[in-house]
Amino acid sequence: MPWASEPAGQPTGQPAVTLDDIAEWFTRRVGRELGPSPWHEVTPEAVRGFADATHDWQAIHLDAERAASGPYGVPVAHGFYTLGLIPYLTSTLFDPSWIDVALNYRLDRVRFLTAVPVGSRVRALARVRGVRVRPRGYLEVVLAVSLMVEGAEQPACTLDHTRLYTMRPDASRPVDGPVPRVMYPPERPAPAPAPAPAPADSLTP
């Protein structure tokens, strides 16, 4: 279901808004706080999956017994795992229905301030730092982001996150007011079926 309907009488095939309109929507929010995002649980399974994907199997992330004698006393998530949550968490802070493609472009002024214990919950706060229309149909949006751990006073990390967006052909102006908690991009799709094995005679020259 779309976030906002097209204006009545909109010509078929014409966008309800332009990229400049979307840029203006963000420009009016420069300096304003967005959020917080919904809470997100940092599960042991997710941390283990990240460890396997990045080959970072340090005991402070995976071994509760050894982590107990380490600097944090409990297993903690990888710093880059927490960074990897930023696009997902910040995508809940504004209406994403106009977005076709979202690209991570830059991370600046990244600071890891406190550890994120495995099993804790995190959420994001952000402020719009800047916005501009770039060549080839991209909108650049810079968010100053703080990732917060439930129960902690200090952010786990802070950073400036720059993303490039392209606009859907049928986009409408982002909705104002409370933001529906809808994730962009959509949830993980079901695994694709395995390809059929090639005939044996096709494998020989």
Language-model segments: what does each one mean?
Residues 142-150, 154-173, 177-181:
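Flexible glycine-rich active-site/ligand-binding loops centered on an Asp-His dyad
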Residues 103-150:
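Hydrophobic beta-sheet segments that form the core/acyl-binding groove
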Residues 62, 98, 122, 138, ...:
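Short linear functional motifs in flexible/disordered or boundary regions
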Residues 2-7, 11-104, 168-191, 198-205:
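Hot-dog-fold acyl-thioester-processing enzymes
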Residues 110, 126-129, 164-168, 183-186:
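Short alpha-helical linear motifs
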Residues 33-37, 41, 121-123, 140, ...:
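Intrinsic-disorder/low-complexity, polar/charged segments enriched in Ser/Thr/Lys/Arg/Asp/Glu/Gln
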